[in-house]
Amino acid sequence: MQYKDENGVNEPSRRRLLKVIGALALAGSCPVAHAQKTQSAPGTLSPDARNEKQPFYGEHQAGILTPQQAAMMLVAFDVLASDKADLERLFRLLTQRFAFLTQGGAAPETPNPRLPPLDSGILGGYIAPDNLTITLSVGHSLFDERFGLAPQMPKKLQKMTRFPNDSLDAALCHGDVLLQICANTQDTVIHALRDIIKHTPDLLSVRWKREGFISDHAARSKGKETPINLLGFKDGTANPDSQNDKLMQKVVWVTADQQEPAWTIGGSYQAVRLIQFRVEFWDRTPLKEQQTIFGRDKQTGAPLGMQHEHDVPDYASDPEGKVIALDSHIRLANPRTAESESSLMLRRGYSYSLGVTNSGQLDMGLLFVCYQHDLEKGFLTVQKRLNGEALEEYVKPIGGGYFFSLPGVKDANDYLGSALLRV
């Protein structure tokens, strides 16, 4: 059946029907259109999530035991401060900016339009906290002759050296200080970085930067779901329970009985590794071989021969590695012996995707971050066990560094690094 339109041209009835539906939708009378209008777009955060916040003051810095947020950035800086007084000014200023940014508030107005705006404006007129955490760590180089801090250097802090499989780029290594910035959304992370750089032009210079992510649903699980890395395997299954305070005192935090400088108590050693994946090569590798390399089922995350992700592998009943290979990643990283208990660490890694390399390969990988009370017993011991593992054929560490995450800020009269600088 056909109708004539207002110009006298024959028009199919289906087209005319669509026009009627469109008119009803504009009038608010179409149930389908109304339903779509009230639905949130996929992946968007509710207002409650944007206003989620982590406490800033406390014995420890946020961003270490905090359940992983979806977006993350690592930024290493060279410190431009000329003396210890300048360094104190830097740490006080960073503390002030962190306190504001993590708790949120109205964006500052610019009183004189002839001057640069006081805020980048990328979050609008209200800066939502968005579950933001900013964790400040210091590198080995901060304890050189510039500030007279050498006697106070954490005992196990050292410059990152090359392991056999490393292909380190000097431009992506080390730093006087490192910021780990995490939030629910990437725009909040970027806003925080720009705010910090704007306020410290004479005190900090960016050395290197990398941005990372985990899946939105893993972040929303608040630590109950293990993130999946870009090799398709769950990453962090064997992490110790971050909600167990007694265990965290043993694994993560520097304590008084370690004979470290007194100011380090409540802080943590941080190892950072930028690891590039050969994803094209990996994607052409048979599933069975992939699972043998990791020692886990790719879909469930369970140790091979077991049913569930968090099942504990029984290496004693598999001494020849017939079920879980002797050189598998999980068996080398954590042999589950009495001796290996001292090398536990808390992993907080993120995936990255950066474009393509000069050779035309996808530049994807892992921003590996871990925290431990002792760098030598933790990351360094584990990495030595992993030297020569089968996974090395598919991964290439290209940067990173070792740092010490400062203890927390007690209250509004305190500042990050105060115990270090008052010595």
UniProtKB/Swiss-Prot annotation:
Pfam families in the record: Dyp_perox_C, Dyp_perox_N
Localization (cell): Periplasm
Cofactor annotation remark: Binds 1 heme b (iron(II)-protoporphyrin IX) group non-covalently per subunit.
GO BP: any one term: iron import into cell
Cleavable signal peptide: 1-35
Gene Ontology molecular function, alphabetical: ferrochelatase activity; heme binding; metal ion binding; peroxidase activity
Cofactor(s), by name: heme b
GO-annotated cellular components: cytosol; periplasmic space
Family, as annotated: Belongs to the DyP-type peroxidase family. EfeB subfamily.
Complex and partners: Homodimer. Part of a ferrous iron transporter composed of EfeU, EfeO and EfeB.
Function: Involved in the recovery of exogenous heme iron. Extracts iron from heme while preserving the protoporphyrin ring intact.
Protein name: Deferrochelatase
Organism: Shigella boydii serotype 4 (strain Sb227)
